[in-house]
């Protein structure tokens, strides 16, 4: 690994619904601590909480911190940390952990991405050659699962247990939660099993991601599956594999895939910013995060 100017590398992925932290040993690149938590629209409080917990676990250690994610940049500025684009953080993690990957499918709280990788012809390094992202509607994302779970009156955490028992697949729109509701409500009225609706929702997500995002580009294996919705819903991964026609050996679900991008951000502290001094300090960052919302107004 790169020479480190701090004791630990820390990556924070601030998304639309969750905050993820990854603490990495600079000498090995191994994950020492991680956490994935919903922020319930209180991003600053959750970022502060996760950083304080990490400092409590590693007292006296200096942190080099890099933020990524849709909400990461203002926190990087407030805490005098580094900022890295999410797709770059993803590529760093893929390069370090699973360089055989050709395509990564990542589902977040309110976005979905398909990232295509290839070898740089000059350096031979794995790079992200193309990325497709929905970014407009929550269809085909974790929020879509939340919406369907609410319609079924089941907890999001229990959704997988319903889907894995589903037997029959019905046509449900994965493009939008509003359209999905018009498909699902009549099914409920007709007595269709919740298990079948949950499974059908996973098929809708996979169909939307493969057809809507890839837009004709071939998804070649090995394919990596990342993000909370794919980590906590193994049936969703199975559905993707079925629709892509790939085997278990051609599918990669990385260790701790729910914080995989945060892991990449942590690696960036050394691999991309190693020659720069990180200005992050525990006390100064705590004060900045405590008053984050006031300063942003």
How does the language model describe each region?
Residues 180-215:
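Adenine-nucleotide phosphate-binding core of ATP-dependent small-molecule kinases
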Residues 6-46, 127-135:
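Short glycine-rich, Thr/Ser-proximal phosphate-binding strand/loop in the N-terminal lobe
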Residues 119, 127-168, 267-271:
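Glycine-rich phosphate-binding loop plus the immediately following alpha-helix
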Residues 2-28, 101-121, 168:
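Gly/Thr-rich phosphate-binding beta-strand-loop-beta motif of the actin/hexokinase/Hsp70
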Residues 36-39, 54-88, 115-116:
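Short beta-strand-loop/turn "lid" adjacent to the catalytic site in phosphate-handling enzymes
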Residues 142-147, 253-295:
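Glycine-rich phosphate-binding/hydrolytic loop that grips phosphoryl groups
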Residues 83-87, 240-263:
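Conserved phosphate-binding/catalytic loops in two-lobed NTP-binding clefts
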Residues 71, 217-243, 254-258:
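Glycine-rich phosphate-binding loops at beta-strand->alpha-helix junctions
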């Amino acid at each position: 690994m790169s020479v480190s100017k701090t004791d630990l590398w820390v990556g924070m992925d601030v998304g639309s619904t969750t905050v993820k932290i990854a603490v990495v040993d600079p000498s090995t690149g191994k994950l020492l601590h991680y956490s994935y938590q919903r922020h319930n629209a209180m991003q600053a409080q959750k970022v502060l909480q996760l950083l304080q917990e990490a400092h409590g676990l590693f007292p006296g250690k200096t942190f080099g911190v890099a933020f990524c994610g849709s909400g990461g940049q203002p926190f990087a500025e407030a805490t005098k940390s580094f900022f890295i684009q999410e797709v770059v953080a993803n590529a760093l993690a893929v390069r370090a952990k699973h360089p055989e990957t050709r395509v990564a499918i990542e589902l977040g709280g309110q976005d979905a991405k398909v990232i295509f990788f290839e070898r740089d012809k000059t350096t031979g390094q794995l790079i992200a050659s193309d990325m497709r992202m929905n970014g407009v509607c929550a269809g085909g994302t974790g929020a879509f699962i939340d919406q369907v779970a609410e319609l079924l009156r089941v907890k999001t955490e229990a959704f997988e247990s319903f889907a894995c028992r589903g037997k029959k697949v019905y046509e449900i729109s994965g493009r939008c939660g509003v359209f999905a509701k018009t498909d699902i409500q009549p099914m409920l009225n007709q007595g269709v099993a919740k298990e079948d609706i949950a499974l059908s929702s996973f098929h809708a997500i996979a169909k939307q991601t493969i057809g809507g995002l890839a837009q004709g580009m071939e998804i070649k294996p090995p394919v990596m599956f990342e993000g909370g919705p794919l980590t906590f819903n193994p049936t969703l991964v199975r559905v993707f594999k079925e629709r892509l026609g790939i085997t278990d050996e051609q599918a990669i679900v990385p260790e701790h895939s729910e914080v995989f991008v945060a892991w990449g951000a942590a690696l960036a502290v050394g691999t991309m910013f190693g020659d720069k001094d990180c200005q992050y300090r525990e006390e100064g960052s705590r004060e900045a995060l405590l008053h984050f919302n006031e300063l942003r107004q």
